[in-house]
A protein has these predicted regions:
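Structured, active/binding-site neighborhoods that engage oxygen-rich ligands
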Residues: 1-130
Length: 130
């Protein structure tokens, strides 16, 4: 993995880790100026979320396939993350969205009206860097 990709993933992970304890809280009810624990998921300090885990899983699939997009490899890594706690900060998968869980359990994307979220936007960085 080259330096630019590492820097991008590190930046994503740090920002994500700062935000995990404050997820789902209204603005202006907290100061995210230092690493802290807790939050809705009661996670220890230094925990990143599904966003970083799935970004790392995507990078791993791209690395494994010589920078070629292999959707099956990405899907496999996402399933390993969800079911076996891979790519997590503390060997604990949490905050798996319903749409993500259903798609991974079925091994196919969903196409109903309410299955379109913003998760892909948070995991697209590796495709721009590889």
């Amino acid at each position: 993995m080259n330096r630019t990709i590492k820097d991008c993933v590190y930046g994503l992970a740090v920002g994500d880790t700062l935000g995990v304890p404050f997820e789902f809280r209204p603005r202006n009810t907290f100061n995210a100026t230092t690493m802290t624990s807790g939050g809705v998921w009661n996670q220890p300090i230094g925990t990143w979320s599904d966003d970083t885990s799935m970004t790392i899983a995507t990078c791993d699939a791209l690395r494994e396939n010589n920078k070629k997009i292999d959707l099956k490899a990405i899907q496999r890594n996402f399933v390993i993350w969800k079911d076996y706690d891979a790519y997590t900060a503390h060997n604990n998968t949490f905050d798996v969205g319903n749409t993500t869980a259903q798609a991974l359990d079925r091994r196919v994307g969903l196409d109903d009206l309410y299955s379109n979220g913003n998760g892909s936007l948070m995991r697209i960085a590796p495709f721009n860097l590889y």
